[in-house]
Design a protein with these regions (language model features):
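Basic amphipathic alpha-helical segments that dock to polyanions
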Residues: 56, 60-66
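Short coil turns linking two alpha-helices in DNA-binding domains
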Residues: 51-52
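Short acidic, hydrophobic short linear motifs in intrinsically disordered regions
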Residues: 38-45
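Short helix-coil-helix linker/hinge
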Residues: 19-25
Length: 148
């Protein structure tokens, strides 16, 4: 099991969203923040053997509702979760960035630093959220591919 730190920023984040600071919640945040890719519930289940599936589902659900994490789907349709930027609010996600799906390792990356084009919707349309996907090879898989 990976090393997990109980970080004060996670306690502050839970306080900010009026959530109890439970061990499983703090561990989920720590595990998710330690990765540079989005994480699926099955991946978290494999790391957190002492937390049952229903509890983990509820943690992910409340974190998404509160704007702590956002959901992104991989190429297989599996929901993955990543920590939101600090400007997300309850029921109002601001994580409008490119999500990159690697076609080899199946990891999902949030590419937050890219400038996205503005989208002008036709009259009468109102976007409530926005998701942009790209797929291909991540740097690690691309490097392996080039060595062949």
């Amino acid at each position: 099991m990976p090393q997990v730190q109980n970080d004060n920023r996670f306690e502050h984040l839970l306080d900010h969203h009026h959530l109890k600071k439970t061990g499983p919640r703090l561990r989920v945040l720590s595990m998710m923040s330690s990765k540079n890719t989005a994480t699926s519930q099955p991946d978290l289940e494999n790391l957190m053997h002492d937390v049952d599936r229903v509890t983990l589902y509820r943690i992910l659900n409340v974190f998404e509702e509160k704007g702590i994490i956002h959901k992104v789907f991989d190429l297989n349709g599996t929901a993955n979760y990543a920590i939101c930027h600090s400007n997300c609010e309850e029921h109002n996600h601001q994580d409008e960035h490119l999500h990159f799906n690697c076609t080899v390792c199946n990891n999902v990356y949030c590419l937050n630093d890219l400038n996205l084009p503005s989208i002008n919707l036709p009259a009468g349309f109102k976007a409530e959220n926005f998701t942009l996907y790209a797929s291909g090879l991540c740097p690690k898989c691309s490097k392996k591919e080039n060595k062949k």
